[in-house]
Amino acid sequence: MTGGLAIVGLGPGDAALVTPQVTAALALASDIVGYGPYVDRIPPRAGLTLHPSDNRVELERAQHALEMAAEGRRVVVVSSGDPGVFAMAAAVFEAVESGPQHWRRLQIDVLPGITAMLAAAARVGAPLGHDFCAINLSDNLKPWALIEKRVRLAAEADFAMAFYNPRSKARPDGFARVLKVLNDACQDNRPVIFARAVSTPDEAIRIVPLPEATPDMADMRTMVLVGTSATRLIARDDVPFVYTPRSVPARSGFE
């Protein structure tokens, strides 16, 4: 049997948002590897072995998947959202680079998925309609000073921003520091979108002006989107539409 490895994104939660390409790869898999809650999204079937693991063993998980693929198994590594956005694709290639030479000859495919920032943005309109950046606010794998620097520079450049992993029980104070950086740098009422558990039954959307945003509005299941100085709200009876215009006037202070 010829083995191989697919690194796939399961999207934000709704099964309807899993791509046909990913669905086909899962149907052919002999082994599924991933963080426990993501593996739990895969229905068991005959001939399929599930390998759930903790969220702090990404490199070990990648190495295990590569070892099985080298043995001829059809392995799928699952991530939520897109596998190349703060997810397992980078960990797999890190393992390939530092591992045995024969891993470099394996068939390895990265199959994209719908990442949380795009699902969240779609719920309210087009807040990422112009230049934007995505920042992971977890300091598990990078120093906090770097996070603050990137947030400050993005705010000063007037990017729209998407924040992954804004707050957790282990990191209760970091998001408060981010909000302070934003308020100091922006000093305006640009909208902040808190999109929790998008595309699941627990979905909740909240939009507030930046000065009114508070840390307790976010948790690990929340995607936070911050608009630019040009981002607009269109009022309506339900949640307003939010969009960032695609053009920037010549006299915008950034000449």
Segments predicted by a language model, with ranges:
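A short acidic, often aromatic-flanked loop/helix-cap motif at beta-alpha or helix-coil junctions
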Residues: R56-R61, A116, N140-K142, S199-D202
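Solvent-exposed alpha-helices and their adjacent loops that cap or buttress functional pockets
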Residues: M1-T2, A24-A25, M68-A70, V77, ...
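A contiguous loop/helix-start segment that scaffolds small-molecule binding in enzyme catalytic cores
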Residues: L5-I7, R74, E156-E255
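Short, active-site-adjacent cap segments at secondary-structure transitions
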Residues: V39-R41, G84-F86, M117, S199-D202, ...
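Class I S-adenosyl-L-methionine
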Residues: M1-L111, T214, A250-F254
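Loop/helix-junction capping segments adjacent to catalytic residues or to phosphate/diphosphate-binding pockets
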Residues: A16, L59, F86, L141-W144, ...
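Structural signal for conserved beta-strand scaffold positions within catalytic alpha/beta enzyme cores
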Residues: G34, P52, V110, C133-N136, ...
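Class I SAM-dependent methyltransferase SAM-binding "motif I" and its flanking Rossmann-like core
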Residues: G3, V85-A157
